[in-house]
Amino acid sequence: EGEVLFQSERAELYREYFEKLRESARVYPCFCSRAALHAAEAPHLSDGSVVYSGTCRYLSAEEVAEREKRRSPAWRIQVPAEESAEIRYSDGLLGECLQNLARECGDFVLRRADGVFAYQLAVVVDDALSGVTEIVRGEDLRSSAARQVWLYRMLGFETPVFYHIPLLTDAD
């Protein structure tokens, strides 16, 4: 019910919330390509993704300026240190869930190098501003829930209740 929203038309709104996160000094430019990350980083998770090690996290202003001459950066948000990176949330079907952002995903992208805002930021902003209180989705998206819960909290939004349902994999 209501207006249909297109993420492709909401870049200015996402930029506003991206800037709020940048003001927290947790957002930084990252010049690592996906190919370089997959080739150099370990461990790879079971879904093929990589835990980002923070390669670009502490670049100096001079290093950033030099690298910007060669390529546009993506922008990542620094997750809490290992000891405070545990995100707990309630899943209406699975009960209490726990994920350590530092260990299981690392700093993650908020805005890609081409300027497009990442799904993690866009979905949190859209759902929060639309008044979404319950999210029902497949088990395959459970690994992104903790990142989203953390972004809800960082932006001062109420966290919805998640329901991750099993996927149908065959006719039986």
Language-model regions, residue ranges each:
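Conserved alpha/beta enzyme-core scaffolds, especially Rossmann-like or related mixed alpha/beta domains
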Residues: 1-36, 76, 162-164
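Active-site cores that bind ATP or allylic diphosphates and position pyrophosphate for catalysis
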Residues: 34-172
